[in-house]
Amino acid sequence: MVSTPARMPGFVILTTLISTGLFHSIPVSFRPMSFIKPPKTLLRQVGRAIIDFNMIREGDRVLLGLSGGKDSLSLLHILHHFQRHAPIHFELAAMTVDPMAGDFDPSPMIPYLKSLGVEYHYRKEPIMDMAKKHMGKPSYCSFCSRIKRGIMYSTAREHKFNVIALAQHLDDLAESFLMSAFHGGKLKTMKAHYINDDGDLRIIRPLVYARERQTRAFSEASELPVIPDSCPACFSMPTQRQHMKELLADEEQLNKTLFKSLLTTLKPLMSEGKPE
């Protein structure tokens, strides 16, 4: 095993994966190079979601799933901002699972998280090779998602995190709702806050009131180091989700209050199973 230095006051541990597959840790200064303040509207929406669904509590240790995309990077900065200004204390770390697919390269996240003073865990797994052996092509994305989630759960347990934060937004929930209704015959969507099956981790989605166009605008205006999605499975075929995205975009052209109405529709569904 690789020994890790003890935590020191004013320091956090940046965890990265080396070629042997073992972790090593580097103490880095907790003081970030600079703070990026997210837009007030995003802060207000996320703050409201956190309150409405009781997502983050005093003393929580939160592990953020960081893909390097615009949504997870936006949520990183929002939670980072709340760490400094919220009336409660919570700890924040981030994790990237590299599925070893296409040209995906999360290495820019390492110095970036270091500059923010955020503890970072990076793990590399041949998920695409596993999917090719065990799944049909249309199932790659769901298989990858399940494996990544399992890796995040095990990492959270190992490092004593009790909350996992995911970056799905209102557009994602609306698309999931239509997919479930059209293809599954059920009225359901992603939950805003729930407990995993083992009962030891809470999973939260603080962006459930926010739109995708907001995270895109924030990431572009702030020049966040977005890593393009380069998974070949995601681009080799049209997906049900992409079809729903296009359907919603067409409908929103005709109905500008579409997502306001959808949020009213979805709120009881996303509230199911909310922990007290």
Q: Can you describe what each PLM-predicted range is?
A:
Residues 2-12, 17, 28:
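Short amphipathic, helix-prone segments within low-complexity/disordered or flexible regions
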Residues 31-179, 183, 213-221, 273:
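ATP-dependent adenylation/nucleotidyltransferase module used to activate substrates
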Residues 92, 172-250:
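Catalytic subdomain that performs nucleotidyl-dependent activation
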Residues 99-101, 127-129, 194-197, 210, ...:
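Residue-level detector of flexible, active-site-proximal loop/helix-junction positions
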Residues 243, 247-269:
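An accessory alpha-helical subdomain
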